[in-house]
Design a protein with these regions (language model features):
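Surface-exposed, charge/polar-rich loops and edge strands
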Residues: 3-46, 50-62, 76-205
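Short hydrophobic beta-strand that contains or immediately precedes a catalytic carboxylate
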Residues: 64-67
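Cys/His-coordinated zinc-finger cores
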Residues: 73
């Protein structure tokens, strides 16, 4: 039987964290690295002491991240050795196949590649440094920061927005001029064609 636990905190090596998705937005990671670098040593310690990475324990007791992949990657790139995690569920009694099925059905996994295509569970990287860039995930994050849509608790909401933009903004436009693509995406986000997406804020009045 699946064991749900009361959240408990423990320090874990960043290098040992296991992703539950294939992609992140490298632009998002760069912004988080800037935020970390702007903190004094004291404030950085306080930040790490209050920002916990939520994980689910899998086979062999490994820590599988179910959120904050961008922060975990930023910490890795900044040379942070360990971080506190919050253990939300203990599924360590399951074999690998059953574990992945449970994660998938609990919306604790996003096995989609940088083209928005679903991939086998085996394609999910084994460590945060192997996560792949999806520029449209960065675009979705930028549009949210600009007020294009509201933060929403729907699992992987930003990836739904990323897929929406992927179908409407060419990769060449996004690659050549991120700011221009962001302005176009902001316009799209406020149109009624996006009203099915989590956090949609209505048309621009």
């Amino acid at each position: 039987m699946m064991s749900e636990t009361r959240p408990m905190l423990k320090p874990v090596l960043v290098a040992d964290l296991r992703p539950t998705q294939i992609t992140i937005g490298f632009h998002e990671v760069a912004l988080k690295r800037q935020e970390l670098r702007a903190l004094s040593a004291r404030k950085a310690g306080a930040f790490l002491g209050h920002h916990f990475i939520p994980v689910v324990l899998g086979p062999k007791g490994q820590n599988h991240i179910i959120d904050h992949h961008h922060l975990a990657r930023a910490l890795h790139e900044e040379g942070v050795r360990d971080v506190f995690v919050s253990v939300l569920a203990d599924l360590s009694m399951l074999d690998k196949e059953a574990f992945h099925v449970v994660l998938d059905n609990r919306a604790w996994m996003h096995p989609f590649d940088a083209r928005g295509k679903r991939r086998p569970y085996s394609d999910i990287p084994k460590s945060v440094d192997k996560l792949v860039d999806d520029p449209y995930r960065s675009l979705a994050g930028e549009v949210r920061r600009r007020g294009g849509y509201a933060k929403d608790l729907t699992p992987f909401a930003e990836f739904l927005w990323a897929d929406f933009f992927r179908r409407r903004i060419g990769a060449d436009v996004l690659g050549d001029d991120f700011d221009k693509a962001s302005r176009r995406a902001l316009q799209l986000a406020r149109q009624t064609i996006a009203n099915y997406l989590p956090g949609w804020s209505g048309p621009d009045m």
